[in-house]
Design a protein with these regions (language model features):
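Short amphipathic alpha-helices and their capping/turn segments at secondary-structure boundaries
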Residues: 81-95, 193-202, 237-249
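Metal-dependent phosphodiesterase/phospholipase catalytic core, i.e.
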Residues: 230-238, 252-255
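Single conserved hydrophobic/aromatic residue that forms the stacking wall/gate
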Residues: 256-267
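Conserved catalytic or regulatory cores that recognize and/or transform ribose-phosphate-containing ligands
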Residues: 12, 20, 24-28, 32-33, ...
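A cross-family glycoside hydrolase active-site/sugar-binding cleft signature
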Residues: 72-76, 103, 180-184, 209-211, ...
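Active-site beta->alpha loop and helix N-cap motifs at the rims of alpha/beta catalytic domains
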Residues: 116-235, 247
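Active-site-proximal loop/turn and secondary-structure-junction residues that shape catalytic pockets
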Residues: 74-80, 106, 185-187, 214-216, ...
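N-terminal capping/small domains of soluble enzymes
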Residues: 2-159, 165-175
């Protein structure tokens, strides 16, 4: 987040004609610009586009050097995600290469209104998208909180201390990180998979994990007895997810296929 962006926001707001009217005297363009910086992601699509570019960069870095890996932390509630990322940023000084991972088994066990369930796609199909939205709501709140504190420090600082605080504002790193979201086996045919993927992307997901099992017979990927779909059917679901990403303008999409127990593969 750069100073020039803040200045640009102030200049843009100053061009709003209402600021010249007496009824707007109490509204300060600088404060409105601060609020815009505290809420730089206006929608889940904005988040998906931002995080997808991060993930693509990280995958390219890993392909070039396997020691440049990422870490994905399981998370089942927005507050947990918020505290994780605040702690990570405080400990490491950055959120770089730190992701959140929404596994289907975790959603089934901890987020279903039916109560704890096994990893068999029996939970509500919209629960993953709902959790994605919740996580990013809390992470955006973390941004607003930290920047709000810096703005208050800036207002109270002496002239000699202001440049240091301004530099912290200019170099602020968001708590928004990529989410890998599990769509199980798509919760139906390719059209159902497309609709579900679209909802997840609209909530902010930049990466979707999908399995080639029959949706109604879905089991945990670590268990035996899985019933898989024909190759053509699975490709149709993969393409359905790709179309969902492309329709929403998220071009740096990422898809992961569970090809065997404990192994993830990019597709």
């Amino acid at each position: 987040m750069s100073k020039s962006k803040f200045t640009t926001e102030v200049e843009h707001l100053n061009k709003i004609t209402e600021f010249t009217e007496s009824s707007w005297n109490s509204i300060k363009p600088e404060y409105a610009a601060r609020m815009r910086l505290q809420n730089q992601f206006k929608s889940g699509i904005d988040i998906a586009k931002y995080t997808s570019s991060l993930m693509r960069k990280d995958m390219d870095a890993y392909d070039a050097d396997s020691s440049s890996y990422t870490q994905s932390l399981g998370c089942w509630h927005g507050f947990i995600a918020q505290q994780k990322l605040i702690s990570i940023k405080k400990h490491f000084g950055t959120t770089d290469k730190k992701y959140l991972y929404l596994s289907g088994w975790m959603i089934a066990a901890l987020r279903s209104e039916f109560g704890p369930l096994p990893d068999q796609s029996m939970h509500e199909k919209t629960s993953v998208a709902a959790l994605i939205k919740e996580l990013y709501t809390f992470l955006r709140q973390a941004d607003a909180r930290e920047l709000g504190g810096l703005f208050r420090e800036l207002d109270a600082a002496s002239d000699s201390d202001k440049p240091t605080i301004q530099e912290k504002i200019d170099s602020f790193e968001t708590h928004i990180v990529p989410i890998i979201a599990d769509i199980d086996a798509g919760f139906g045919n390719e059209e159902a998979t497309y609709l579900m993927a679209k909802q997840m992307i609209e909530a902010g997901a930049c990466c979707i994990q999908i399995e080639n099992q029959v949706s109604d017979e879905k089991q945990c990927g670590h268990q035996d007895g899985k019933v898989t779909v024909p190759h053509a059917d699975f490709l149709a679901k993969i393409n359905a997810v790709r179309y969902a990403f492309l329709e929403l303008g998220v071009d740096d999409l990422s898809l992961i296929h569970i090809s065997e127990p404990t192994r993830l593969r990019r597709i």
